[in-house]
């Protein structure tokens, strides 16, 4: 008895603490009331989803549920087929344009204008992230182009303002004045350069650009190569004695052809040059061809006016050395490279030059024959200056002493050469 009394006393003492800590220890009526209050509170905040018990559902309800699932699946399949047929009938270019317009309305970085080729390139992108990156690239490119245009217009306006201030008032009022020198209009300059280009096509020395490297370049590198070709053609057109330019291995409908037609536009058919799908081997004899490549072991000493020089239209940013040299060897052609180490203190880096730099060097060699003048078109960031001329004269004397023709020179000619080289150094 005393043990039972002690246990009852302890239970009555601990009961209020248990009610506070654990609500489930309440009486049955209070527990039911607590649960109903919680259900009403939760139902007002979040709609509760009730899942039927599979064991309690009768078989008739299970059959109706299965029928509903079958009908829903069939309707979804019909919708997929209809959307697939509609997507096939719809133009993919129009769908891509709609996607771009939707992204523009959402405030994403999308260009305002883009060409058909850029749209086709966007269609070839597989994932959404690649499409987004490509559109961002076009957006940044368009913004940079607009910024350059604005900067160019501002510079032009700044240059024109002081010129207007320097002109007298009589000239400002009436532009038709008599001057000492005849004014050359742009139309007259175009006619003069056209005559020179026509003469070069008939009597000029050929210069061939090998266009068979479009498979070795990425689209961005090919665009860079076309920009260099445009610069080369303009430099040749403005020269006193231009080359007769050949674009050999130019496939009609190829990447090079499309980009050139896109850049030139209507002027492409009016250019005074020869564009052909034939190879340079089919047009000229192999004995008169010299392929210029930086990988050649043969160093170019002088410019030969009776030879036909070939320049590979290849922008190599992926470091593919020996590509043009291998092609020249495969065709059994003579190769040469520019004497950069002989005249320049070359620093680290490749000796590949751009197409417009090669054009300027060859034009200068053709007109002057001076390597010192021609190699001024090599970028100064690639070398540390010219070598001393006395070093070349000493090398020349050493070669002449070793050769058999040293004794055939008249007396005093070697000394005169030394004195002249010393005077040049002074």
Curated annotation (Swiss-Prot):
Its main location: mitochondrion. GO terms for cellular component: mitochondrial nucleoid; mitochondrial ribonuclease P complex; mitochondrion; nucleoplasm; nucleus; tRNA methyltransferase complex. Signal peptide: none annotated. GO terms for biological process: mitochondrial RNA 5'-end processing; mitochondrial tRNA 3'-end processing; mitochondrial tRNA 5'-end processing; mitochondrial tRNA methylation; mitochondrial tRNA processing; mRNA processing; positive regulation of mitochondrial translation. One of its GO terms (molecular function) is tRNA (guanosine(9)-N1)-methyltransferase activity. It is found in: Mitochondrion matrix, Mitochondrion nucleoid. It is an enzyme of class 2 (transferase). Residues 193-385 form the SAM-dependent MTase TRM10-type domain. Its EC number is 2.1.1.-, 2.1.1.218, 2.1.1.221. Residues 1-41 form a transit peptide. The modification Phosphoserine is found at residue 86. It catalyses: adenosine(9) in tRNA + S-adenosyl-L-methionine = N(1)-methyladenosine(9) in tRNA + S-adenosyl-L-homocysteine + H(+); guanosine(9) in tRNA + S-adenosyl-L-methionine = N(1)-methylguanosine(9) in tRNA + S-adenosyl-L-homocysteine + H(+); an adenosine in mRNA + S-adenosyl-L-methionine = an N(1)-methyladenosine in mRNA + S-adenosyl-L-homocysteine + H(+). Keywords: Coiled coil, Methyltransferase, Mitochondrion, Mitochondrion nucleoid, Phosphoprotein, S-adenosyl-L-methionine, Transferase, Transit peptide, tRNA processing. PROSITE patterns: SAM_MT_TRM10. Residues 138-166 form a coiled coil. Mitochondrial tRNA N(1)-methyltransferase involved in mitochondrial tRNA maturation. Component of mitochondrial ribonuclease P, a complex composed of TRMT10C/MRPP1, HSD17B10/MRPP2 and PRORP/MRPP3, which cleaves tRNA molecules in their 5'-ends. Together with HSD17B10/MRPP2, forms a subcomplex of the mitochondrial ribonuclease P, named MRPP1-MRPP2 subcomplex, which displays functions that are independent of the ribonuclease P activity. Component of mitochondrial ribonuclease P, a complex composed of TRMT10C/MRPP1, HSD17B10/MRPP2 and PRORP/MRPP3. Interacts with HSD17B10/MRPP2; forming the MRPP1-MRPP2 subcomplex of the mitochondrial ribonuclease P complex. Interacts with GRSF1. Belongs to the class IV-like SAM-binding methyltransferase superfamily. TRM10 family. This is tRNA methyltransferase 10 homolog C. It comes from Bos taurus (Bovine).
